[in-house]
């Protein structure tokens, strides 16, 4: 995670003794969250004063020493990849919209409590599936969150020849979660695309993946190049068992999976949370690492596949990703 914190915001934040719930959440994020990079607009001359006078800066420094930058805005737009980026400034800036369109979250001192409370209120929820599923309208709540990545982890969500379950579930999910004001990459981590008797035929897998991607692209208006299907394998030493839809800042889980329209009630639950709960931040961080390992491995195997194919050697179909080339 990247935190961009303006010095003026930090000074005002450190003086706040209200003990409000959202204040406590943000303070915990600054001080207790691990594996983050923190950028603050300060220089060496200001360091001693901040370290001695600002309690939050002092505590933050002991966990994740901040990186000094000359300008929050300039560093953000020139260096950040907006993978998981949150900005805190003292006043609302005219460049917030541009940063949010890239997938960042932007707050100022006057609105951070209100905006984060709205995110927590809208996106921390549970849905009981012992009652008949009522549809995907609850995903409208995601309009309160900015993100540029959706990863759907479900071994069976794209399996079978019938497109109806994709049309009734995946398409409305993506339509609800799609945000028109920023680029969105969608990845499916799945286990089965073709029947068992075709699993040894890479071209059949590729053909099926293309059909799925093209259908999803045509129905959601997402560019074909922004949709990826990644086949899971058994060599990762990690079991992607539970079904999850994750963004840069949130996790939506359902043990039963996300093929829900028209199916019988069950003992499953849909749970949604964001990184404004530390437990969920840690879970999302760990799973994102595993997803990235999986994707990197698939790219390497993909290169092997092309090389093996040119040499006339039968490739291993367990490792496969579409689009077939990122160049």
Named regions from a protein language model:
Residues 1-128, 140, 167-327:
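PLD/PLD-like phosphodiesterase catalytic module centered on the HKD motif
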Residues 1-8, 145-156:
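Short hydrophobic beta-strand segments
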Residues 143, 163-166:
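Hydrophobic alpha-helical segments and helix-packing faces
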Residues 159-162, 197-199:
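A generic structural signal for short coil/turn motifs at secondary-structure boundaries
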């Amino acid at each position: 995670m990247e935190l961009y914190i303006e010095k003026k915001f930090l000074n005002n934040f450190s003086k706040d003794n209200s003990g409000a719930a959202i204040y406590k959440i943000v303070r915990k994020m600054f001080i207790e969250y691990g594996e983050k990079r923190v950028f603050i607009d300060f220089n060496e001359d200001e360091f001693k004063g901040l370290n001695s006078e600002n309690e939050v800066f002092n505590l933050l420094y002991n966990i994740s020493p901040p990186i000094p930058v000359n300008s929050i805005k300039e560093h953000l737009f020139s260096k950040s990849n907006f993978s998981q980026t949150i900005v805190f400034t003292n006043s609302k800036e005219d460049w917030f919209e541009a940063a949010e369109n890239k997938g960042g979250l932007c707050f100022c001192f006057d609105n951070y409590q209100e905006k984060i409370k709205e995110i927590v209120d809208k996106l921390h929820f549970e849905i009981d599936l012992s009652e008949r599923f009522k549809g995907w309208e609850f995903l409208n709540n995601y309009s309160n969150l900015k993100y540029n990545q959706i990863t759907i982890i479900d071994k069976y969500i794209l399996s079978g020849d019938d497109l109806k379950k994709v049309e009734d579930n995946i398409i409305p999910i993506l339509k609800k979660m799609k945000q028109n004001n920023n680029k969105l990459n969608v990845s499916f981590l799945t286990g089965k695309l073709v029947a068992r008797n075709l699993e040894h035929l890479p071209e059949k897998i590729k053909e099926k993946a293309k059909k799925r991607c093209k259908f999803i692209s045509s129905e959601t208006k997402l560019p074909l190049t922004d949709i990826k299907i990644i086949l899971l394998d058994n060599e990762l030493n990690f079991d992607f068992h539970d079904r999850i839809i994750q963004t840069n800042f949130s996790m939506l889980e359902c043990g039963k999976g996300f093929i829900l329209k028209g199916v019988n009630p069950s003992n499953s639950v849909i749970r949604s949370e964001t990184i404004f709960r530390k437990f969920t931040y840690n879970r999302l961080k760990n799973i994102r690492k595993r997803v990235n390992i999986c994707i990197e491995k698939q790219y390497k195997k993909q290169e092997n596949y092309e090389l093996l194919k040119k040499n006339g050697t039968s490739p291993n179909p367990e490792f496969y990703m579409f689009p077939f080339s990122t160049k």
